[in-house]
Amino acid sequence: MNDRVGPAIIVVLAGTLLGVVAFLGLGLGDDDGSPDASPTTTAPAPVTTVPGAPGTSGGAPTTGAPGSTTTTLPARQPDEVPAWTVGRPWGSVRGVTMFRGNPTRTFHGAGPIPDSPTVAWTYPDQAMCGSSSVGGETTTWCGLGWTGQPVVYEREDGITEIIFGAYDKSVHFVNAADGTDLRPPFRTGDIIKGSVTLDPDGYPLIYFGSRDNKLRIVALDRETPTEMWSLDANEVRGVWNNDWDGNPVIVDDIMYEGGENGWFFAYQLNRSYGTDGLVTIDPQRLVAMPGYDDLLIQRSGRNVSIESSVAVFDQRVYFANSGGRVVGLDVSDIRNGNAPIVFDYWAGGDIDATPVVDADGFVYVSIEYEPSLGRSTNLQRNREVGQLIKLDPYTDGDPLVWGIDLTQAGADTGIWATPALYEGYLYVPTHHGELLAVDTDTGDIVWTDNVAWHTWTSPLVIDGTLIQATCNGEIRAYSLDDPASPSPLWTTQWAESCLEATPVLWNGSIYIGSRDGYFRALR
C-alpha cells in the first residue's frame, strides 16, 4: 500500500487536476441467504498482451480537453489507481466511460459550460417504457432513472456517440449531433437501472447489468451489438434479488462489480483480438465473495444487496451495501485470487450511493435514512453515524472522521446521490430536497439551497461550475468562484417529470434521461 499523500500536496493536486479532459478508456431468485456460503476463487489465466492495443497500464498516458494540446501525465504501476488520477478521466480514448468517469468516481465530464441551455434534441420518437415485476407486482417503468448516467464516446471516425441503458429493457447508441440511432438497440429481458461502462482501454466492448439477472459484456465491432459473455446472478447463493444496479469498473483487464444478490465479483477479462481483427474475451473469475456475514444479517436483516458502484484507489477496492456495510479489499494480489478485507465499517443505514475517494485516500459515503422500513437497530446506528460520512480506511483507530445527521422527525430522508468533490468541499443533494456544500476537513455544512424533494441525481462539478438536476425537471448551475458559497448562474426547466438519472456534460452539451420516457441533449 502507498502511504497517504500529505494534505497540502493533495489540495494543490486536486485544484490543478480537476476538470482536465483526457484520452479516456473505451461501464428475484434464490433467497436462501446463507451467509456461510464460501467465497470462490479461480486462478487467473495468463494476461494476454496485444501488440499495439491501447491500455491504461504503465507508460505515461496523455490527456487533453477537446481541441487542446496533450499533456504527459505521470506513469502508474499496473493494478494501481494512484492519487493523481482523482478528478481525471480514465483510459486511452476521450469521453466519459463509466459512472462518475473514473475508478475513484470523481470525473464528471468536460466543458465548456452552456449558458441557460435549451433542448437541442429529444430521443426517441416514442417513450422508452417497459414492464417489470417486483414481489409479484408488475408495473410500467419509463425513461431513465437512478443511476442512469450515459457514456460519452469520442469515436475515431469523428462521431460522438452517447450510450445508455433505459427502462425499455435496451441499451441505446445515439449520435450526439442529432439524436439519431447509430446502432440498433441491444435488447435484454428486463429493465436497465444502472449505468453502462465503455471499455476504458479502447477495446470495442461495453459492460452493464439488467434486471433479467444478467451482467453482460457486449461487443461493438460486429454488424450489430453482440453479446460475448454474461454472468447470471443465480450462479451463487445470494440474497435479496438478482438485479445489477452497480456500474462495472475496469482496471488493467480486471472487472470489479457488485450485485443485488449481495456478492462482489472480480474477473480477469483476457481481452484480445482474433485473427479476423474482431475483439475477443475470455473472462476468468478471480474472486466471488458475499458482501455480508452472519453479524450483518443479524444487525440489518436480509437486505444486503450491493446497489452502489465499486470504487478503486491505490490497490484497494471499496464497495457498500444496503445493510450499511462499507468494505475495503486489498487487491494487490488479485491476479492470484486473493482479495483480503482490510477495511470493514458498519454505518447502519442503506447505502445505494457510490463511495467517492479523494486524492488523500479518504472515503465519502452517502447513506439513506428509512424509518418506514422499521429496522430499529439499523436506525439507531444510522442516527449515531449520520447520513453523510467521511472515513479514514487506513487508521488503526475509529475510521469515522465526521458524520452529518440529516434525519427529519420520522421521515424517510438521507442521500441517494453520489457526492462531488471540489477544492476542499463536497456537494450533494438530500432526498428531503436540500443541496449541501460541506467542508471536507471539518464536516461543517457551509451552504445550502432548496431543490426538489427526491433529488437522487448526482451533481457535476466542471470548470468551476456546479450543476444539479432535480426531481421537478430543473437543471441548475452555480458558480464555484467561492467554493464555500456557490452562487446561482442559471436555472432551466424543460421537463415536467422527475430527473433521477445522473447527467453528463461534454463539450458544451448536457445529456440526461428523464422519467417521462425520453433522453435529451441540452445546449
Task: Give the location of each predicted region.
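N-terminal export and membrane-targeting signals
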Residues: 1-14
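Extracytoplasmic/lumenal domain signature
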Residues: 67-94, 99, 106-146, 151-245, ...
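Hydrophobic single-pass membrane-insertion segments
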Residues: 20-35
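Extracellular mucin-like PTS domains
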Residues: 37-72
